[in-house]
Each structure stands twice: as structure tokens, then as C-alpha cells.
């Protein structure tokens, strides 16, 4: 096939065999967020480039290397969103929904775009679910976000495979003092740093802490610690968060090198990580960004949020074999009809069943075919039961119900009793 007719490298099709697990995951998250009082917001996938330069930071890897940026026909510089927080802040500012101190607890879902090197768990188009809260500045809301994700891991059956890492970045003033001390320490050891860290030292020194280079990591062992430069306000906030996590029974580790890759974070930052996915171990991350709204032209507004990568979490569910059987099975009942009269009767009968059992996944054979071919398709569909309607069943106004996944003989069920029978053996288990 011509390359121009293939998916772009790092941007993948999600095929019908994969979507049931995606829908299961997305539905589980959506129900949880609804239960906690969060409301969905939907933003465009394209924004003015300046939005991300102002919010993420011009000297970050995302802005410098990874954004998909282009000029439209009006000459405006536009960018496919690389993350969701900046777009969400822009939306709440544009529509004034945080004015007057209104608390907003929002969530969104959709694709993000970064021109990174594709590998397992990292793609150029990837999907995130993000949560943002505005006008709440206490550690209680930070804790709620983490407690909520902890509950999600329990619902998905993956708690034992993830670990919570925490840090506090302090206020911008505290970070400035720390940055000065870190630069002084690293500048004296410049020849021991890898090339990328030398560049970051000039543009974004805190990102050196995030290095994966062994020699630079060795240099950082004796580097100044951010915790020693925290302001009192941030220290009290962080202690309040830890106390709440302890009360909720959520285990965590303090990672003093956790700084996140975006300039807008302050105070709390956190990541949920796993060792089950190789190098791409972060499955959910977030933190507080109290200065971002003001930085983007609004009034001082507290903000905190997180984003989780759907691809990585779906991959983790598959790796841990936490895919519910009913998710893997896309069809409950498959109906085989033989002859035009049976097909017409089947149409009326199945629609009546759907009226009475709206959650039943009932597939009707299309394209006619012999008994053998239809039954083969019924078996291949993964259905629990095949319904059989031929001339004899039509004359007697019954339908054959044959188990496909277990013991038991075929039964003939009267049409009027079909819904009740399927409810007892399929819907109610």
C-alpha cells in the first residue's frame, strides 16, 4: 500500500476488537467522575500556538521540539493541542465561568498530539482523560484528586501495579531561590553532565532533575534539595496533603526529583507510575498550577488537575489480564433465521426483545446463508447463545435457544416467553 494511504507513524487506528476495552475504561472513569461531582467540558483540538507558548513555557521540550504547528490560510499560527490544561484554562477564561470565585470541577477526554519518537506506550497521537479544578486552593482538593484515582485503580483491578510519587515545587519565589542554588551546584560540575542536561541547565534547570542519564544522576545525589527551599505556605500545604492521604490509607513515596515537564506547576505535583510497561511507566500525573490563569490574562485563580493516558492504562489492563469477560465478548445472543418468512418474523421478534431487554447485545445474521454457515458465524461472534428460527419453529411459533459456551441442550421457547428466558440466562447471568 502507498505510504500516503497508511496511518501516519505514531498515530494508530483503534480497531473494533480493541474498542470494547476502551469503552469499558472510559465509561468507568466517566461514572466515577460523575459520582464525585465533576462535569464534562469539550474543547477544540486546535488552538493558537501562542496559548501553549505562554502556558507550557517556550523553553520546554514540548514547545521547542514536539508540537504540531502550522499556519492556516489566514496566516495564523495554529497548533494541535499537546496537552489539555492550557486549552481548558483558555475555555474557562473565555466564557467567564470561574469569575467571582465560582468553583469549577471539570473533566475532558480526547486526543493530544506530540511529535515524539514512537515506542510502546508513547505515540504521536495519544488520548487522555483530564481533570481540572478551579478556585479551590487547599490540600483537601489535591487529596480528592488522588483519592479519586486510587478508587479508579481499585475499580479496574490494578492497584497493586501502580505506585504514587509525590513532591512539592513550592511557590515561584521558592523555586527561584532553589533554581539559583541548583545552577550554582551544577555549573561547577558542568563537564560531568550529559549534553542534554547541559542545555537544560541554561534554559530550564529544574528539568535536569528529570534526567535518565546515569552519570548526571550520580552528580545529582549531592545536589541541593528542593524541600530545603520550600516556603512555609507550601510546606504546610504539603503536610496537609500527606495527612489526608495517610487518613485515606493511600501509600505514597516522596520523590524529590519529581518536577513534571511543564512550567506552570507549583506546590503539589504527583505521578502514578508502574513497572509493568517498561520505560513508559507514568500512567497518570498532575499537580497544582495556581499562577497559570493569571499568567494567561485572568485574575489570580487557584488551579489543580491531572491527566491520565488512555493507551497506557488500556495496555496495563491487558498486561495484567484485567479485561472482564463480558468486555471481551461483544455479542450475547446471535439469531440465525432460515428463509424469507423466518427473516421477517425474526425482525419483529428481535425488536420486541430489544424493547424489553435494552441492555441485551443481540445480533441478527445478515446475508442469509445455510444453517452451517450461519451457525459458524454465531459461534465466531462469541455469543453465549444462538437463536434458531426455521420453518418448523416458525410454524410452531417457537424459537430454538442453543447454548454455545457451556453444557445444556437446545430448548424451544415460545415467542412470548423469549424475553423472560433470555433475561434469566443472559441478562441476570
Swiss-Prot record:
Compartments, record wording: Cytoplasm
Gene Ontology CC annotations of this record: cytoplasm
Keyword Protein biosynthesis: yes
Keywords: Aminoacyl-tRNA synthetase, ATP-binding, Cytoplasm, Ligase, Nucleotide-binding, Protein biosynthesis
Main location per the UniProt record: cytoplasm
One Gene Ontology term of the molecular function aspect: histidine-tRNA ligase activity
Protein EC: 6.1.1.21
Subunit structure as annotated in this protein's UniProt entry: Homodimer.
PANTHER family: HISTIDINE--TRNA LIGASE, MITOCHONDRIAL-RELATED, HISTIDYL-TRNA SYNTHETASE
Protein's UniProt name: Histidine--tRNA ligase
Amino acid at each position: 500500500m502507498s505510504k500516503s494511504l497508511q496511518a501516519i507513524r505514531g498515530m494508530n487506528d483503534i480497531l473494533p476488537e480493541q474498542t470494547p476495552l476502551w469503552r469499558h475504561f472510559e465509561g468507568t472513569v466517566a461514572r466515577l467522575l460523575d459520582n464525585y461531582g465533576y462535569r464534562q467540558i469539550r474543547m477544540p483540538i486546535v488552538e493558537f500556538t501562542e496559548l501553549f507558548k505562554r502556558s507550557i513555557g517556550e523553553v520546554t521540550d514540548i514547545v521547542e521540539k514536539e508540537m504540531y504547528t502550522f499556519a492556516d490560510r489566514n496566516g495564523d499560527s495554529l497548533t494541535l493541542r499537546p496537552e489539555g490544561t492550557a486549552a481548558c484554562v483558555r475555555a474557562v477564561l473565555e466564557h467567564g465561568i470561574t469569575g467571582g470565585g465560582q468553583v469549577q470541577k471539570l473533566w475532558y477526554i480526547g486526543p493530544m498530539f506530540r511529535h515524539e519518537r514512537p515506542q510502546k506506550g508513547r505515540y504521536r497521537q495519544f488520548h487522555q482523560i483530564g481533570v481540572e479544578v478551579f478556585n479551590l486552593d487547599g490540600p483537601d482538593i489535591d487529596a480528592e484528586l488522588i483519592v479519586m484515582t486510587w478508587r479508579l485503580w481499585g475499580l479496574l483491578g490494578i492497584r497493586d501495579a501502580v505506585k504514587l510519587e509525590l513532591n512539592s515545587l513550592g511557590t515561584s519565589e521558592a523555586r527561584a531561590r532553589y533554581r539559583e542554588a541548583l545552577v550554582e551546584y551544577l555549573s561547577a560540575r558542568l563537564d560531568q553532565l550529559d549534553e542534554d542536561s547541559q542545555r537544560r541547565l541554561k534554559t530550564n534547570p529544574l528539568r535536569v532533575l528529570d534526567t535518565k542519564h546515569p552519570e548526571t544522576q550520580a552528580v545529582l545525589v549531592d545536589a541541593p534539595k528542593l524541600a530545603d527551599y520550600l516556603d512555609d505556605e507550601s510546606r504546610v500545604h504539603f503536610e496537609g496533603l500527606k495527612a489526608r492521604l495517610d487518613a485515606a490509607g493511600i501509600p505514597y513515596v516522596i520523590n524529590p526529583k519529581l518536577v513534571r515537564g511543564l512550567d506552570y506547576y507549583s506546590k503539589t505535583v504527583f505521578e502514578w507510575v508502574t513497572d509493568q510497561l517498561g520505560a513508559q511507566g507514568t500512567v497518570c500525573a498532575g499537580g497544582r498550577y495556581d499562577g497559570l490563569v493569571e499568567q494567561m490574562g485572568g485574575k489570580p485563580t487557584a488551579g489543580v488537575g491531572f491527566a491520565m493516558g488512555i493507551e497506557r492504562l488500556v495496555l496495563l489492563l491487558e498486561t495484567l489480564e484485567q479485561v472482564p469477560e463480558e468486555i471481551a465478548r461483544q455479542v450475547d445472543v446471535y439469531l440465525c433465521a432460515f428463509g424469507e418468512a423466518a427473516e421477517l418474523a425474526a425482525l419483529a421478534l428481535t425488536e420486541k426483545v430489544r424493547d424489553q431487554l435494552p441492555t441485551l447485545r443481540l445480533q441478527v445474521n445478515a446475508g442469509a446463508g445455510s444453517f452451517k454457515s450461519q451457525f459458524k458465524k454465531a459461534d465466531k461472534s462469541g455469543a453465549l447463545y444462538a437463536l434458531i428460527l426455521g420453518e418448523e419453529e416458525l410454524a410452531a411459533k417457537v424459537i430454538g435457544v442453543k447454548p454455545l459456551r457451556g453444557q445444556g441442550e437446545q430448548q424451544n421457547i415460545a415467542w412470548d416467553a423469549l424475553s423472560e428466558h433470555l433475561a434469566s440466562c443472559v441478562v441476570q447471568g
